[in-house]
Amino acid sequence: MALYETILIARQDITASQVEGLTETFTGILKENGGEVKKVEQWGLKTLTYRIKKNRKAHYVYIGHEAPAAAVAEMERNMSINEDVLRFMTVKVEKIEEGQTAMLTNKGERSERGPRGGFGDRGPRRDFGDRGPRRDFGDRGPRRDGDGPRAEGGRNEGEGDRA
């Protein structure tokens, strides 16, 4: 038997107990067909990157299991039939990691680091008065505003009196 990791995404409008019921249903299918569930994690309600079937949030569930291919196929068939499951993905792995997955580990580290900042903590804006005077490389005509070194008379060459 091979080792697999399955992630399923369930609709946002079902309760946490219903998500647990879904998880028990799918792990039961694996056990009935000769598989063994190694690890189950509820990652909770998370915001989706894009809408899936009109849902902006979804419940994520991780299942690490060892099962024959027929058991995995039967579980995936039941997931595709179930209307509460938005998406699922099963991947064959070499080993199932002990302890928490990265999704749960990062959640704890993030809160220990403190606030990550944003646009509100940048401080006052500089006034851009530190640039100095405009430079003249000699490859352009005179400037119209009076602060350039070649601005004389306020008009460009070739601009005469127009009638």
From Swiss-Prot:
Coiled coil: none annotated. Gene3D superfamilies: 3.30.70.60. It comes from the Bacteria. Keywords: Ribonucleoprotein, Ribosomal protein, RNA-binding, rRNA-binding. Pfam families: Ribosomal_S6. One of its GO terms (molecular function) is small ribosomal subunit rRNA binding. GO terms for biological process: translation. InterPro entries: Ribosomal_bS6, Ribosomal_bS6_sf, Ribosomal_S6_plastid/chlpt, Transl_elong_EF1B/ribsomal_bS6. GO terms for cellular component: cytosolic small ribosomal subunit. Residues 122-163 have a biased composition (Basic and acidic residues). The keyword Ribosomal protein applies. Residues 97-163 are annotated as: Disordered. Binds together with bS18 to 16S ribosomal RNA. Belongs to the bacterial ribosomal protein bS6 family. NCBIfam families: S6. This is Small ribosomal subunit protein bS6. It comes from Rhodospirillum centenum (strain ATCC 51521 / SW).
